């Protein structure tokens, strides 16, 4: 290596970090950023600044650069692309050597890629659109504690989506009344019930009281139906120690599945909890509370496809992914993209779905996609079509809002699901023929008939805020 000499001062980032001739290595971690630069900052300099500030650079040259191989460790901005329909911003593709990141630590990856660089003054707005994790890094992460196949074997249910329900009202019920609602929903035909994300341990219902009543309800429903049932017990807590205390108690009373809010709870806590679940044979349901703070602004933040990849690496057997048809944000093409990233072993680049890189997961198991938020029986044909079998369809208000009560709401959803799955297996176009399929099933199910009458006019037809850039062409 040639002798280097130190020259103090400030130089343009592009002199060191803009490398359009660079060909990424298979072991590089690749990132795509959407950059909106400040006025007067050209694209190459802005891209190089992001590469520098998210890897080895600082605002001035430092003599300690001579003590390491900066040419190896630096991030490299190697490509720039236009954003379709928006000339205020551009895509910058940056390659990072794998040795910049601690093995198995999504915390460390995010600290670099979405750390101080997001407050950099030369950048008006910055969004992390996608990451390609090299297989060499994927193999250092434990991933889902169980995965899709193991969970199906545990609950002994195959060939259809699973049915769930979030207990409502989400806050205010006593432990006994909460357990009663769980029992009625599970007895009526659901596979799972669920704590809402903001149920932890409040004055109206402490966590241990809830766990006890819920497990009693679950066991009673199992005995009466002959099916394996479960309730997602939310162990999210103020401290990691308290979180693990609640998880241990859930295991002690025989609960098959626990739940964590992975963004508000933290990626470090989630990775640790996933490892605990793997060691203790527990299923882990993941809620994405706070995601929209990060991913809904189309110019600044972190796209949900990145948060999906991070969760798969950190660990979780279920992840909320939106519904397309319900009350929450998420267009169809994007949602199908991150569902594949959650479940498939290999996902190729597909700009029509917002996927910027090939992603190889190797042998890492996938996780169930969870559809939840403003859905009811009329949505069932679309949900079965969009999400397929390896999903959990969760109807909260669409179960507990039934005029005849919780058990009737659960029965209506179970009949609707089985009718749609049967029609699909017969080769019918379920989404197109949905009304006919549900109407025929309702002739033999008064619970479904009443549900269809109750929610026939309920739609959530709002435009998506975060559109795929490809749709702007």
From Swiss-Prot:
Annotated InterPro entries: RuBisCO, RuBisCo_large_chain_AS, RuBisCO_lsu_C, RuBisCO_lsu_C_sf, RuBisCO_lsu_fd_N, RuBisCO_lsu_N_sf, RuBisCO_lsuI
Signal peptide: none
Taxonomic lineage: Bacteria, Pseudomonadati, Pseudomonadota, Betaproteobacteria, Burkholderiales
Entry protein name: Ribulose bisphosphate carboxylase large chain
Reaction(s) the record says it catalyses: 2 (2R)-3-phosphoglycerate + 2 H(+) = D-ribulose 1,5-bisphosphate + CO2 + H2O; D-ribulose 1,5-bisphosphate + O2 = 2-phosphoglycolate + (2R)-3-phosphoglycerate + 2 H(+)
Other comments on record: The basic functional RuBisCO is composed of a large chain homodimer in a 'head-to-tail' conformation. In form I RuBisCO this homodimer is arranged in a barrel-like tetramer with the small subunits forming a tetrameric 'cap' on each end of the 'barrel'.
Binding site for substrate: 116, 166, 170, 288, 320, 372
Chain positions found as N6-carboxylysine: 194
Gene name of the encoded protein: cbbL
